[in-house]
Amino acid sequence: MYNRYVTGQHFIGRKDERAILGNLLSQSENVVIWEPFGTGKKSLVHQVFTKMKVDGNRFSVGEMTALDIREGEAFVKRLGAAVIRLVASTPDEYEGIVTKYLEGTHFVFDRKAFSDLDVILSTNWDLDDNDLKAVLRLPYALAAERGEKTFMIIDEFQNLDLAGDGERIFKLMEQVMDEVKAEGLRIFSYIFIGSQVNAMED
């Protein structure tokens, strides 16, 4: 995906921004890019990843949108599914990851739900904070197992803040980020892209 240069008016004067973003990502720092809709945020990220590829860096990039997210738990499920799809592609592989990394949680891989609804993460009970943190730790664990830097782009992340339990999810994410940083695990990071668009406008 990130193998061609992108040019356009939005990149005039953005050389410094590209350099700063590239430096942050090379250190596996989490990044927030907050600008109005249509100002070239994704293209900026695209260019940085392209340069990283040209420079010989090996990494994986996943992407998800939070535009239609109205519940924090739905956000976590979508994030978990996006992370799993980044490293697996078959039902057996999906089930293997859920069994290995989410054992002891209320998350399961339901083959019927996957077949009927393309759902990777189903639940067998109400979710608690430990369940959610297990999924939030998943991208770090999978990246470490593969030994490859991994980035997850979350587009329109501001919608999580509008969700009823959004603050809870943000706090859990911060806890996990602090924990993995303390463990010295610097192989995964988020790129949060935000604008003024939100699901409540639908």
PLM regions with names:
Residues 16-20, 135-138, 172:
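Well-ordered alpha-helical segments embedded in enzymatic catalytic cores
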Residues 13, 64, 192:
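Small/polar loops that bind or transfer phosphate-bearing groups
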